[in-house]
Regions:
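Short, solvent-exposed loop/linker segments at beta-strand-coil boundaries, enriched for Pro/Gly
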Residues: 262-264
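Conserved Walker B
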Residues: 36
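Active-site-adjacent "subsite" loops/lids of carbohydrate-active enzymes
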Residues: 1-26
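Aromatic- and acidic-residue-enriched carbohydrate-binding clefts of CAZyme catalytic domains
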Residues: 1-9, 39-72
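C-terminal beta-strand-rich structural cap/linker in extracellular carbohydrate-active enzymes
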Residues: 267-290
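Active-site-proximal substrate-binding groove within the catalytic cores of carbohydrate-active enzymes
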Residues: 63-250, 254-260
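Short acidic/polar active-site loop segments enriched in Thr and Asp
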Residues: 29
Length: 290
């Protein structure tokens, strides 16, 4: 059972005070909030909601400012006790900027259980992902929620890696193993120091075929290029990626490897030919030949 509450009530003080007490008693690093930043209708006239019209019929009130006040106060509680403290907000589909602005990260995706469509591209067009799930326009780190879609954890990582977004492990132990491999890879490559070149903005340095395939790139000043190659098509296919090596700061002769397994890949002339299943992906690390 899910119990919804309105923060234009004593619940605001209750949640804030309870969070402060728990952090003080147990030294918590922060809080996970499940839907706390969502705006929901309230009809309770005892705390100022549910205004009535001329015939006595109650109407809902959406308490933006009360919910924003709660989130702001929670941020003050967490950050004053731990400057690196986390407010991890699960707010699927409710991208209400006044309330989510005080979180440190977002977890989004549960609404996809009811999104129309038979295949993943039908249920998640790429412009939909860019609009809601990247976190850039909210100024927040984003994670993707994967457990509602009928696809494997690995398959969903392809979609999110393409957008520089991690898929949170939630379930079997092998999910954490894959996630940790990817986290470690990004640390080794130097993702924080790299320039990200997403698939919709890198046509001057790379081309990819067929049309249902995409590639996003990370360009590091010393460590080469990390390519995320993804087949968003309905069938297995060979994906061809042609890199403009000079524009990417790569030497004429480069070494290409599968970034997770270390397996050598052919990159003759700066071109990769990768057989990928539908929703399959591969991370390719390209470096100067030693």
């Amino acid at each position: 059972t899910v119990y919804r509450v309105c923060y234009q009530s004593l619940w605001e003080d209750f949640v804030v005070a309870g969070t402060a007490r728990l952090m003080d008693e147990y030294g918590l690093d922060g809080v996970y909030l499940d839907g706390t930043g969502c705006l929901l209708p309230c009809y309770n006239h005892y705390h100022g909601c549910g205004p009535r019209d001329g015939v006595g019929r109650a109407h809902p009130r959406y308490t933006f400012w009360a919910t924003r006040s709660l989130m702001r106060r929670l941020w003050q509680v967490v950050s004053s006790r731990n400057p690196n403290g986390q407010i991890n907000l699960h707010n699927s589909a409710f991208m209400t900027v006044p309330t989510i602005a005080f979180a440190t990260s977002l977890w989004d995706g549960e609404q996809l259980s009811t999104t129309p469509g038979r295949t993943l591209p039908e249920r998640m067009p790429l412009d939909y992902f860019r609009t809601e799930f990247m976190g850039h326009q909210w100024g927040l780190a984003a994670e993707f929620l994967e457990y509602v879609l009928p696809y494997s954890y690995r398959q969903e990582w392809g979609l999110t890696l393409l957008h520089d977004v991690p898929t949170r492990p939630y379930g079997p132990h092998d999910q954490l193993e894959l996630a940790s491999q990817l986290w470690n890879l990004m640390e080794r490559f130097g993702r924080r120091q790299a320039t990200w070149l997403p698939y919709w903005r890198n046509g001057d340095v790379v081309t990819v075929q067929p049309s249902a395939a995409y590639v996003s790139l990370y360009r590091h000043p010393r460590n080469g290029v990390l390519a995320v190659v993804y087949n968003y098509g309905a069938r297995a296919t060979e994906v061809t990626v042609a890199l403009q090596r000079a524009k990417l700061g790569l030497a004429e002769r480069v070494v290409a490897t599968d970034a997770l397994t270390g397996m050598a890949l052919d990159c003759e002339g700066g071109t990769l030919h990768l057989p990928l299943d539908s929703l399959g992906w591969q991370l390719v690390w390209l470096r100067q030949e030693q």
